[in-house]
Amino acid sequence: MELIEQVAVAKKANIYFEGKVASRSVFFSDGSKQTLGVVLPGEYEFSTSQGEIMHVTSGSFEVLLPNSSTWQAFSEGSQFELAANVSFKIRNNAIAEYCCRYL
């Protein structure tokens, strides 16, 4: 298991889509922030306010990236990058987890 050490973690979760997506904010001493999330099976659309890198930490997602008409598969250990101010969709058939690093 990979660990994130010497951080502060928000006690309150960020809850989306009627509880089907939940994440916790993790704050680093250098001022940066990441979120660790769990996604129940379904299809969801998100928007970014800043650039981010999404790391799939367990399970898998299909992702419809901005300006694309083709869903792409991302499994555990893979990642994809998103620009600021874009929308994208994810879907999954089983519980999956991610770590989002903000750029």
Curated annotation (Swiss-Prot):
Gene3D superfamilies: Jelly Rolls. SUPFAM superfamilies: RmlC-like cupins. Disulfide bonds: none annotated. GO terms for molecular function: guanosine phosphorylase activity; purine-nucleoside phosphorylase activity; pyrimidine-nucleoside phosphorylase activity; thymidine phosphorylase activity; uridine phosphorylase activity. Keywords: Glycosyltransferase, Transferase. It comes from the Bacteria. It catalyses: a purine D-ribonucleoside + phosphate = a purine nucleobase + alpha-D-ribose 1-phosphate; adenosine + phosphate = alpha-D-ribose 1-phosphate + adenine; cytidine + phosphate = cytosine + alpha-D-ribose 1-phosphate; guanosine + phosphate = alpha-D-ribose 1-phosphate + guanine. Pfam families: Ppnp. Belongs to the nucleoside phosphorylase PpnP family. This is Pyrimidine/purine nucleoside phosphorylase. It comes from Shewanella oneidensis (strain ATCC 700550 / JCM 31522 / CIP 106686 / LMG 19005 / NCIMB 14063 / MR-1). The gene is ppnP.
